[in-house]
């Protein structure tokens, strides 16, 4: 199985496809504008995920789940961005919105928490991306 990691920022979105062992097999990135609104950003994110999965030469069925790192205050239980100044999001049900395009388990947390978890699981590996 493979996993999709998504990093949402105020000016862009980055996506990585990783193996069970943590090896990155594909990456993608796009620029975004917060002025477009969350609906457009989610649609662009879904397209980027689909394109990156295709670039990895795997099928959507090979993807186990999607994890999203997002700046701001996050309700990880509801899959909602409570408030993100960078993105101009307020009470955005991000996981539910993305699920309209991609039917996979989707998880979200604050981007700093995601970075800390990545560092922890890499245990000081100098090649962490």
Give names to the regions the model predicted.
Residues 2-47, 80-83:
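Short glycine-rich, Thr/Ser-proximal phosphate-binding strand/loop in the N-terminal lobe
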Residues 9-11, 62-64, 110:
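Short, basic and Ser/Thr-rich N-terminal targeting/leader segments
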Residues 8, 71-72:
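Glycine-rich His-Gly loop
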Residues 43-50, 92, 96:
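N-terminal, well-ordered alpha-helical segments
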Residues 20, 65-67, 73-129:
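Phosphate-binding/catalytic loop of phosphoryl-transfer enzymes
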Residues 1-2, 129:
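Short, hydrophobic/aromatic-rich segments at coil-to-beta transitions
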Residues 45-66, 105-106, 124:
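Phosphate/pyrophosphate-binding loops at sites that engage ATP/ADP/AMP, CoA/4′-phosphopantetheine
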């Amino acid at each position: 199985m493979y996993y999709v990691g998504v990093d949402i920022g105020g000016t862009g979105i980055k996506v990585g496809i990783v193996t069970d062992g943590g090896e990155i097999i594909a990456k993608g990135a796009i620029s975004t504008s917060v002025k477009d609104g969350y609906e457009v950003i989610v649609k662009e994110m879904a397209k980027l995920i689909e394109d990156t999965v295709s670039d990895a030469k795997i099928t959507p069925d090979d993807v186990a789940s999607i994890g999203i790192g997002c700046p701001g205050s996050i309700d990880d239980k509801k899959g909602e961005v409570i408030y993100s100044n960078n993105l101009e999001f307020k009470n955005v049900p991000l996981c539910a919105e993305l699920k309209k395009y991609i039917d996979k388990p989707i998880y979200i947390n604050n981007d700093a928490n995601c970075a800390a978890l990545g560092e922890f699981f890499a245990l000081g590996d100098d090649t962490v991306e």
